[in-house]
Swiss-Prot record:
Belongs to the phenylalanyl-tRNA synthetase beta subunit family. Type 1 subfamily. Residues 39-154 form the tRNA-binding domain. It is found in: Cytoplasm. This is Phenylalanine--tRNA ligase beta subunit. GO terms for biological process: phenylalanyl-tRNA aminoacylation. Tetramer of two alpha and two beta subunits. Residues 408-483 form the B5 domain. The gene is pheT. It comes from Staphylococcus aureus (strain USA300). Its cofactor is Mg(2+). Pfam families: B3_4 (PF03483), B5 (PF03484), FDX-ACB (PF03147), tRNA_bind (PF01588), tRNA_synthFbeta (PF17759). Keywords: Aminoacyl-tRNA synthetase, ATP-binding, Cytoplasm, Ligase, Magnesium, Metal-binding, Nucleotide-binding, Protein biosynthesis, RNA-binding, tRNA-binding.
Length: 800
């Protein structure tokens, strides 16, 4: 946003230099990126009056002009501009003058004719060709109003000015207008802000007699209003208005279009001017575009519309693409006499999608995208009516034709002086705080200690108490707040939360087991999004992914861990042991946020123990991976059980579900050989646990158990069972009948082969007995052992 100091003075008067103002604004959080001085590098530039023009005797394209520059005698200047003529007021660079680019003006002879100065174009005095009125693009600038020869040309052009260029953050859309900036400056200097004139002399004729407005979807268009102005005269706008537009980076067109742009910059409220007679009906209908509907915009481009686009129509045909660009046949032309002025509120998301899809970014669309101030919609239209009456001889019809609701102009937020002072660490009185809010243009209501701040709609960045605290600190001055130690109501010693403590314990266990922690992307390809998922739900896909490999939110940590293992193995690091604690995401119903669940996953491949002179090589296998998982359960004081399972992507015979309190909380298994081969991996084992589920059950500590005072007893038992019976089922039966003296069990041998029937296997299990209160006797242990054996026989086992 470009802010002219000359224009700013119309609303707020301060006694300070522009450089100081820019510094103060920057210190409050609005960065002034540049300070543009239009007088820089310019010297001896005056207004001249061309008294006569004659053709150069030796050059067809040159003219010899006698120019009055306010001195005793006119000066002779040779000029090659095609539009120079007698009777014009022009810009003259005198001899000894200087122009941008280091150009110095000297006396010269051009084809034998003396030339004492230079008649200038706007481009030659530093104005970008992008902003020069088209009538002066290829020639000198000619004043449209009489001037006094010899006066300062920059003053006559309203260019003796300095312009601040703001680098605004998206939340400060209020500073995208002169009035919004004026409120900010008035607050900084504790002075009043004067708003511009908006009252017109209206005709007795009502706009309601000539126009109706209908909104079909108020969710997309909450409010639409229009006013009508008759008998406008299309001509160039005043010099001062053209200059302000040029300094703001907008090319002047004519008085009607310029007034629309001027009010846009003044209020931050985009307007659109329609040629009333070209609309083709007395109704305006605002609706969603029809599928396949087309319209030609002001840039003479035919646009194919989507149903998500908002269009302004005459009841049948689109006459404007809402908030983005007008239509060609209803635009204001030189012959236009009657004007319809549009002021509206459009859905920011719809405008952003339309403007980006069609690559039609404009001053208007950028403001609609950020949200506009409801308080200024009607006021901006009234301002345009006043300017059309004043500078286009327009006749303003009374009444406003509107549909929809403007919505609230203010948002009340309650706060106390104590809350503000505790946050910024400085004592300000309630009166001082209220004064700052009033400086910002915020009305306040006081009820004992509570200050109710009525935040105007132009400040959409202020929604909570902390935003108000920031405003107080900004306006008071960050540099003026003394440095103090923070004050706390209650001081507590720092410590880890219960979850942080448990998470740290798990990480220590895994790192102690030789695993390295990995952190991988939350985004995966759409194909991998549901791989290894424990809850097969619809994928959550990005609307505009940067790549196909990162198009969806993951439902498992394993796809990227497998990728990481493959990456390491390909680079000769063949012994890979990784774990990750991270979030996975599961979709819910339409309009609901997805579930975010924390998982713990691991992958192991290669050798667990490297072959050294004192150690034998130990390759990763299922039981090693299971041992890692069991160490996690022990650390969290949990008891896992395992159940054979078939899971896509894992070996069909070497995979198990992990259960906690009879609920599946994870799985463990060998990577399917085909998947392993696809990733250039040898035998690889993975596990995945619902970490949130573990945290919900884990007490996080282990009860102290004293060292046994009495000796224990061990008994071994060998069982012949069907080969399909898992050892876990046998152990479950043993523990169910072992009473309180059976402490633990250990499978120490499994045999299949010679001396056993086909389809059978032999399992040897050691049972450890202990009573913490007394010495066990053989009779007591034998009785329990007999009960266990009877239960096993009933299960189909044969005691060997």
């Amino acid at each position: 946003m470009l802010i002219s100091n000359e224009w700013l003075k119309e609303y707020v008067t301060i006694d300070d230099s522009v450089s100081n103002l820019a510094e103060r604004i920057t210190r409050t959080g609005i960065e002034v990126d540049d300070l543009i001085d239009y007088t820089k590098d310019i010297k001896n530039l005056v207004v001249g009056f061309v008294k006569s023009k004659e053709k150069h005797p030796d050059a067809d394209k040159l003219n010899v002009c006698q120019v009055d520059i306010g001195e005793d005698e006119p000066v002779q200047i040779v000029c090659g501009a095609p539009n120079v003529d007698a009777g014009q007021y022009v810009i003259v660079a005198k001899v000894g003058g200087r122009l941008p680019g280091g150009i110095k003006i000297k006396r010269a002879k051009l084809r034998g004719e003396r030339s004492e100065g230079m008649i200038c174009s706007l481009q030659e005095i530093g104005i970008s060709s992008n902003y020069i009125p088209k009538s002066f693009e290829s020639g000198i600038y000619v004043f449209s109003e009489a001037q006094v020869p010899g006066t300062d040309a920059l003053q006559a052009l309203y260019l003796d000015d300095q312009v601040m260029e703001f680098d605004l953050t998206p939340n400060r859309a209020d500073a995208l207008s002169m009035i919004g900036t004026a409120y900010e400056v008035a607050a900084l200097y504790n002075t009043k802000m004067t708003k511009p004139e908006t009252t017109s002399n209206e005709l007795d004729l009502s706009a309601n007699d000539e126009l109706t407005v209908t909104i079909e979807n108020e969710d997309k268009v909450p409010y639409y209003s229009a006013r009508v102005v008759h008998d406008v005269t299309i001509e160039p706008s005043p010099i001062w208005m053209q200059a302000r537009l040029i300094k703001a980076g907008i090319r002047p067109i004519n008085n009607v279009v310029d007034i629309s742009n001027y009010v846009l910059l003044e209020y931050g409220q985009p307007l659109h001017m329609f040629d009333q007679d070209a609309i083709g009906s007395q109704q305006i209908v605002v609706r969603q575009a029809n599928e396949g509907e087309k319209m030609t915009t002001l840039d003479d481009t035919e646009r194919e519309l989507l149903t998500s686009d908002i269009v302004i129509t005459n009841g049948q045909t689109p006459i404007a693409l809402a908030g983005v660009m007008g239509g060609d046949f209803s635009e204001v032309k030189e012959q236009t006499s009657n004007i319809v002025i549009e002021g509206a509120i459009f859905d920011p998301v719809s405008i952003r999608h339309t403007s980006r899809r069609l690559n039609l970014r404009s001053e208007s669309s950028s403001r609609f995208e950020k949200g506009i101030a409801t308080e200024f919609v009607d006021e901006a239209v009234d301002r345009a009516c006043y300017l059309l009456q004043t500078y286009a001889n327009g006749k303003v019809l009374k009444d406003r034709v509107s549909s929809g609701e403007l919505g609230a102009f203010i948002t009340p937020i309650d706060i106390t002086a104590d809350k503000i002072n505790r946050t910024i660490g400085f004592d300000l009185s309630q009166n001082d705080i209220v004064t700052i809010f009033n400086q910002l243009g915020f009305d306040t209501e006081i009820n004992d200690d509570v200050i109710t701040v009525l935040v105007p709609s132009r400040r959409k960045d202020i929604t909570i108490k902390e935003d108000l605290i920031e405003e107080v600190a900004r306006i008071y001055g960050y540099d003026d707040i003394p440095s103090t130690l923070p004050v706390f109501d209650k001081v507590t010693s720092g410590q880890l939360t219960d979850r942080q403590y448990k998470t740290r314990m798990v990480k220590e266990v895994l790192e102690g087991a030789g695993l390295d922690q990995a952190i991988t992307y939350s985004l995966v390809s759409k194909e991998d999004a549901t791989a290894f998922s424990m809850q097969q739900r619809q994928t959550i896909d990005l609307l505009m992914p940067m790549s196909e490999a990162h198009a969806s939110l993951r439902q498992s940590l394993l796809p990227h861990l497998i990728e990481a293992a493959s990456y390491n193995v390909a680079r000769k690091n063949k012994d890979v042991k990784l774990f990750e604690i991270g979030n996975v995401f599961f979709a819910n119903g339409e309009g609901e946020l997805p579930d975010q669940v924390e998982y713990l996953s691991g992958i192991l491949t290669g050798d667990y123990v490297v072959n050294q002179w004192q150690d034998k090589k130990e390759t990763v296998d299922f039981y090693l991976a299971k041992g890692v998982v069991d160490r996690v359960s022990e650390k969290l004081n949990l008891e896992f059980s395992y159940r054979r399972a078939d899971i896509d992507g894992l070996h069909p015979g070497r995979t198990a579900e992990i259960l906690l309190e009879n609920k599946v909380v994870g799985f463990i298994g060998e990577l399917h050989p085909i998947l392993a081969a696809d990733n250039d991996l040898k035998r690889t084992y993975v596990f995945e646990l619902n970490f949130d589920a573990l945290m919900a059950v884990s007490v996080g500590y282990i009860n102290y158990q004293p060292i046994p005072r009495f000796p224990g007893m061990s008994r071994d038992i060998a069982l012949e069972v069907d080969q399909n019976i898992p050892a876990a089922d046998l152990l479950s039966t043993i523990h169910a009948h072992g009473g309180n003296i059976l402490k633990d069990t250990l499978v120490f041998d499994v045999y299949q082969g010679e001396h056993l029937e086909k389809g059978k296997k032999s399992i040897a299990i050691r049972l450890n007995y202990l009573d913490t209160e007394e010495t066990l006797t053989d009779e007591r242990v034998s009785k329990v052992q007999a009960e266990i054996e009877a239960a096993l026989i009933e299960q189909g086992a044969v005691i060997r």
